[in-house]
């Protein structure tokens, strides 16, 4: 629901601990609803003078109540206007994010709970990437991204760095990683960043060859389409897309639009110069 029109504001929930509220009723600052009428996210808003994390416990209690009432656990947000934290407590620890997610981005996160598969068990397509060191690199990525807790599949680290020599098949390896993440339902949309248009074009061509079933665009030449699965871009082009707005004033890409960013040649200078991209998008890196 839109925060602007007041939908979801001060939503009453039942089942709060009596120690918190003798009546057992609580009032959630905001609930963001899915089209099926189930809660996608709960937002606990704190005053700017108060730390955002001060809302974590309260937001968790509200999520418990909403889950009991509607049969779906919402994504948890708490914010003071300066800092915003997201917590999908069924899978990941809390993390700071740029802002709130759009409805389709939240729905994707909730749906993923039921259909996400263990990356460590994935059989890599050796037609894409079959050299022993490539397979080991892919396996290490899987082991880094996945963590098990009490026999349950959970998310591990969200960032990986592969150090590979020129000619060792970096693009093939990254294509195989994308194949793994998409087929295991960890990623739907992927952003590939390079510092030159020629590298962007080469990468798109290679991914089209190895993953022809995934739609792809070169953002330096083609008009963006939000439904595209693979987006290839230079850093400045993507910076402009983040800073600019569509005709209706909304940004082209929400903070949760991409599930994975691949950086070609991840130098420290690149990260420092274009860190706004990585701070804006909440995704695997």
Annotate each language-model stretch with its function.
Residues 249-284:
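SF2 helicase catalytic motif II
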Residues 240-242, 280:
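Short, solvent-exposed loop/turn elements at domain surfaces
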Residues 76-77, 215-218, 261-264:
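Short, hydrophobic beta-strand segments that form beta-sheet elements in well-ordered domains
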Residues 219-231, 252:
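Conserved motor-coupling elements within RecA-like helicase/translocase cores
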Residues 76, 231, 261, 284-285:
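Short, well-ordered beta-strand core segments
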Residues 177, 217-220, 248-249, 272-274:
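Short beta-alpha junctions and helix-cap segments that line functional grooves
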Residues 1-189, 194, 198-214, 226-230, ...:
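ATP-dependent helicase/translocase motor core
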């Amino acid at each position: 629901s839109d925060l602007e029109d007041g939908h979801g504001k001060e939503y009453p929930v039942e089942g709060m601990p009596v120690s918190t509220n003798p009546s057992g009723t609580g009032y959630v600052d905001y609930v963001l609803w899915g089209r099926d009428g189930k809660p996608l996210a709960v937002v606990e808003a704190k005053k700017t003078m108060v730390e955002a994390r001060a809302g974590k416990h309260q937001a968790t209690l509200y999520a418990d109540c909403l889950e009991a009432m509607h049969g779906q656990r919402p994504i948890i947000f708490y914010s003071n206007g300066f800092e915003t934290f997201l917590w999908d407590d069924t899978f990941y620890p809390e993390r700071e994010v740029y802002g709130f997610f759009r409805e389709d981005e939240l729905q994707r996160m909730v749906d993923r709970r039921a259909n996400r598969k263990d990356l460590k068990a994935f059989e890599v397509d050796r037609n894409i990437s079959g050299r022993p060191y490539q397979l080991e690199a892919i396996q290490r990525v899987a082991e880094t991204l996945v963590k098990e807790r009490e026999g349950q599949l959970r998310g591990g680290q969200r960032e990986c760095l592969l150090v590979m020599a020129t000619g060792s098949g970096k693009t093939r390896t990254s294509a195989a990683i994308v194949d793994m993440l998409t087929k295991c339902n960890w990623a739907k949309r992927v952003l590939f960043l390079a510092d030159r248009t020629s590298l962007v074009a080469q990468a798109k061509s290679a991914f089209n060859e190895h993953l022809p079933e995934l739609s792809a665009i070169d953002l330096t030449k083609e008009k963006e389409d939000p439904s595209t699965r693979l987006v290839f871009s230079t850093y400045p082009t993507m910076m402009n897309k983040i800073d600019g707005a569509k005709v209706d004033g909304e940004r082209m890409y929400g903070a949760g639009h991409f599930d994975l960013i691949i950086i070609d040649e991840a130098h420290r200078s690149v990260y420092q110069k274009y860190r706004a991209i990585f701070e804006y998008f909440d995704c695997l890196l």
